[in-house]
């Protein structure tokens, strides 16, 4: 499945900050370190030079990716019409059949973070939640079988 191009404003800002940091701060420092290491002579056995060149390639790869990705991402802001229903950017309190409740936020694929309970809009759970309301039931097929979840609460960061 293709990645969606949706992102929250805070997610877009974080990627933009990362791009600026890599281009304006990190890359010049690494470039200088590579130049200094190259001036020491034999480059074939110069660990600082080899590591610096590798790091420079990593930075350049990430800069290219971020530059292209930021051009196609579509920022989705909160709108009052979303209240009461699950849409992109929503926080949702879900309860399983055992009565355990967990909170998830639906975000773009570039910003999902399991440690924060941020799930990608492209995930099966998020897809099942879109357009649903409080007290609705969703069914999600998982590797361990069908899971039924109940929506207890929906809120948005404004």
Curated annotation (Swiss-Prot):
Residues 53-75 form a coiled coil. GO terms for molecular function: DNA binding; RNA polymerase binding. Signal peptide: none annotated. Keywords: Coiled coil, DNA-binding, Transcription, Transcription regulation. InterPro entries: GreA/GreB_C_sf (IPR036953), TF_GreA/GreB_CS (IPR018151), Tscrpt_elong_fac_GreA/B (IPR028624), Tscrpt_elong_fac_GreA/B_C (IPR001437), Tscrpt_elong_fac_GreA/B_fam (IPR023459), Tscrpt_elong_fac_GreA/B_N (IPR022691), Tscrpt_elong_fac_GreA/B_N_sf (IPR036805), Tscrpt_elong_fac_GreB (IPR006358). GO terms for biological process: DNA-templated transcription elongation; regulation of DNA-templated transcription elongation. It holds the Pfam family GreA_GreB_N. The keyword Transcription applies. The keyword Phosphoprotein does not apply. Transmembrane segments: none annotated. Necessary for efficient RNA polymerase transcription elongation past template-encoded arresting sites. The arresting sites in DNA have the property of trapping a certain fraction of elongating RNA polymerases that pass through, resulting in locked ternary complexes. Cleavage of the nascent transcript by cleavage factors such as GreA or GreB allows the resumption of elongation from the new 3'terminus. GreB releases sequences of up to 9 nucleotides in length. HAMAP family: GreA_GreB, GreB. Belongs to the GreA/GreB family. GreB subfamily. This is Transcription elongation factor GreB. The gene is greB.
């Amino acid at each position: 499945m293709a990645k969606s191009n949706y992102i929250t404003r805070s997610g877009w800002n974080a990627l933009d900050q990362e791009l600026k940091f890599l281009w304006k701060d990190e890359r010049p420092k690494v470039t200088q370190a590579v130049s200094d290491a190259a001036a020491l002579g034999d480059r074939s056995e110069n660990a600082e030079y080899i590591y610096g060149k590798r790091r420079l390639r990593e930075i350049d790869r990430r800069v290219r990716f971020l530059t292209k990705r930021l051009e196609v991402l579509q920022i989705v802001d909160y709108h009052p019409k979303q209240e009461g229903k699950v849409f992109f950017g929503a926080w949702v309190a879900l309860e399983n059949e055992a009565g355990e409740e967990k909170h998830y936020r639906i975000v773009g694929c570039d910003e999902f973070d399991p440690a924060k309970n941020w799930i990608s809009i492209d995930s099966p759970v998020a897809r099942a939640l879109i357009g649903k309301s409080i007290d609705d039931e969703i069914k999600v097929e998982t590797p361990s079988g069908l899971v039924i979840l109940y929506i207890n609460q929906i809120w948005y960061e404004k």
